Regions:
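Thiamine diphosphate
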Residues: 158-176
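A glycine-rich helix N-cap at a beta->alpha junction
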Residues: 8-16
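A general secondary-structure junction signal
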Residues: 16, 126, 159-161
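Alpha/beta enzyme core
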Residues: 1-7, 20-153, 169-171, 175
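Short beta-strand segments
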Residues: 15, 39-43, 158
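Short acidic loop-to-helix transition motifs that present clustered carboxylates
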Residues: 17-22, 162-166
Length: 176
C-alpha cells in the first residue's frame, strides 16, 4: 500500500479477530488502499464458547456485534477514499448450533448496516472438518433458508480437508 503497488482494480483482504485493539490496527493498516475487504471473525462453536472462552451464547453474540459496530464506526470515520467491503465468519460454524449461527450473522448484518446493494460476505467454515459433507451441506441449507437478512448476504462456503472430504463438502454445500 505504502509504495502504491496494488493496482486500482485489485481488492485486498485483511482478517481480524473481534478484539478492539486488533480491529483498530487492522483498519489503520489499510490507509491508502483503494479497495479492501475487512474480514471479522470470532469463535461461535459450543465447545470453544464453553471450554475455551467460558462465555454464554449472549456474550459471544455481543462480541461479534461489538466488533462489527467498531469496524462500521472506524470505516465511516475513515479519512481516505477506500472502498470498504465486509466479511464475517462465525469461526467453527459447523460446531455451532445452527439457530445460533443464524442469529449471530443476522445481528452482524444489522450492526454493519448491510443491504441488498451492499452485501456482507458471510463465510461459513467447516473448521477442522468437524462434520461430514452431508451434515455440512444440511447446515448451509438451514442457514440460507433461515437467515432473516438473506438478501443482504453473500453466502461463502469454507470447507476444510482435514479428513479428506473437502471437495465433497464443497460440492454438497454448493448444491444446498
Amino acid at each position: 500500500i505504502d509504495e502504491n503497488l496494488i493496482p486500482d482494480d485489485v481488492t485486498i483482504q485483511v482478517l481480524t479477530q473481534a478484539r478492539e485493539h486488533i480491529i483498530k490496527k487492522t483498519v489503520e493498516a489499510l490507509k491508502g488502499a483503494k479497495n479492501a475487504i475487512i474480514h471479522l471473525y470470532n469463535s461461535t462453536s459450543t465447545l470453544q464458547r464453553e471450554v475455551v472462552f467460558r462465555k454464554s451464547k449472549e456474550e459471544i453474540k455481543q462480541l461479534a456485534v461489538d466488533g462489527a459496530k467498531l469496524i462500521k464506526q472506524l470505516t465511516d470515520e475513515y479519512d481516505g477514499d477506500t472502498n470498504f467491503r465486509f466479511e464475517y465468519s462465525p469461526e467453527s460454524f459447523s460446531g455451532t448450533e445452527p439457530e445460533n449461527a443464524v442469529e449471530i450473522c443476522d445481528m452482524v448484518i444489522e450492526a454493519l448496516g448491510s443491504t441488498a446493494e451492499n452485501k456482507l460476505i458471510v463465510n461459513l467454515p467447516n473448521t477442522v472438518e468437524m462434520c461430514t459433507p452431508n451434515t455440512y451441506a444440511d447446515q448451509i441449507e438451514y442457514f440460507a433458508r433461515n437467515l432473516k437478512h438473506r438478501d443482504a448476504a453473500i453466502i461463502s462456503i469454507h470447507p476444510h480437508n482435514d479428513r479428506g472430504c473437502g471437495v465433497a463438502a464443497g460440492e454438497l454445500a454448493l448444491l444446498a
